[in-house]
A protein has these predicted regions:
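Conserved HGGG/HGGXW glycine-rich cap/lid loop of the alpha/beta-hydrolase fold
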Residues: 53-105
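Conserved hydrolase catalytic core segment
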Residues: 131-174
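Conserved serine/cysteine hydrolase catalytic core
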Residues: 206-279, 286
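Catalytic histidine-centered segment of alpha/beta-hydrolase-like enzymes
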Residues: 288-298
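Active-site loop/oxyanion-hole signature of alpha/beta-hydrolase fold enzymes
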Residues: 97-135
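A catalytic-pocket lid/entrance helix-loop region that shapes and gates access to the active site
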Residues: 163-195
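Alpha/beta-hydrolase fold catalytic core
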Residues: 2-67, 91-93, 132, 309-315
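Alpha/beta-hydrolase active-site loop signature
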Residues: 74, 100-104, 145, 167, ...
Length: 315
């Protein structure tokens, strides 16, 4: 009997030791990888001083009209994520990609991520760049911030474009389990999961070097202080947006993904509801997933050019 208990005790101790060694290995591999990757992340764009911190911005193209691109939640590198769309738009427009605090190469911030604070920072950035007239084009959560933005700076906005953009009354605006996800990241298990299943990182159609940069920025920025605060403020930001509507004279176009419409039957009707009092608005559905700017950049750019041209001729 004592021999059996001794064997069981040794087995339990062995299992615990193996688990501790495994956890420690995952943690330290992540720690070392993070340090190594700091020197491998390549700079792009330019820095703008906003609210005492550095906000990263890319400007591409020399067109007379300006388009400002705003990312979806948690985008590791908005500049690299929007690359296919920027390449389609920049021959005709000046394209400005904003990397909000906590995204891409921008600084992190401890300022609460309310829609108002995010809008204020984006506007300050554009003012510093002397950009005073532009089309706002936003993906996903930027539909909420964009709605706040156009109501505050209507005189500066020529049009609003939503790429499968969020709407105030959508049903999945719940808070994320921030603490659990941060623990997953800090422990190194997020890196391990990505290593085992790299396809879970949604990537645009870019070269391998760019994909590597996106991957490194994903590990660097994942649920940093800004993104954690943003997630914790989802419910309030969506709720506050329910008081808003698009200005009557503002041209608005929504590019929606048919996969999102299938998953959420109310998706298209909710966007159409936002356009009911808009003089020049439309909804276009493309086949594809939530990241339409990865797969339908050419179609979006062509349709937007026609949409903007038609609205210019009606003025």
């Amino acid at each position: 009997m004592k021999k059996i208990l001794r064997i069981m005790l040794i087995s339990i101790c062995t299992i615990i030791t193996v688990m501790v060694v495994f956890l420690a290995a995952v943690y330290f591999v992540n720690l070392i990888s993070n340090e190594r990757e700091k020197g491998k992340i390549e700079s792009y764009g330019q820095k703008v001083l906003v609210d005492g911190k550095q906000m990263n911005v890319l400007i591409q193209g020399d067109g007379k009209e300006t388009i400002v691109l705003l990312p979806g939640y948690g985008t590791a590198s908005p500049v690299l994520d929007f690359k296919p769309l920027v390449n389609e738009l920049s021959p005709y427009y000046r394209v400005v990609v904003i990397e909000p605090f906590g995204y891409g190469l921008s600084d992190d911030t401890d300022k609460v991520r309310t829609s108002q604070n995010i809008v204020d920072e984006i506007h300050e950035c554009l003012q510093k760049l002397n950009i005073n007239k532009y089309t706002l084009m936003g993906h996903s959560i930027s539909g909420i911030y964009g709605l706040e933005y156009v109501n505050q700076y209507e005189n500066e906005i020529k049009a609003f474009v939503g790429i499968d953009s969020s709407v105030p009354k959508q049903e999945d605006s719940d808070e994320l389990p921030v603490s659990s996800l941060q623990l997953l990241h800090q422990s190194g298990f997020y890196r391990l999961i990505v290593k085992m299943n790299p396809d879970q990182l949604v990537m645009p159609k870019v070269d391998e070097q760019t994909k590597d940069q996106i991957k490194m920025l994903t590990f660097r920025n994942f649920l940093d202080e800004s993104q954690a605060s943003e997630a914790e403020n989802f419910i309030n930001n969506f709720k506050n947006a329910q008081r808003l509507h698009f200005p009557k004279n503002l041209p608005v176009v929504f590019y929606l993904a048919d996969q999102t419409e299938e998953e959420t039957p109310s998706w298209k009707p909710m966007h159409e509801e936002l356009l009911k009092n808009v003089d020049h608005g439309k909804v276009v559905t493309y086949k594809g997933g939530h990241y339409l700017h990865h797969t339908k950049s050419k179609e979006i750019a062509a349709d937007f050019r026609e949409f903007l041209s038609n609205n210019e001729s009606h003025r």
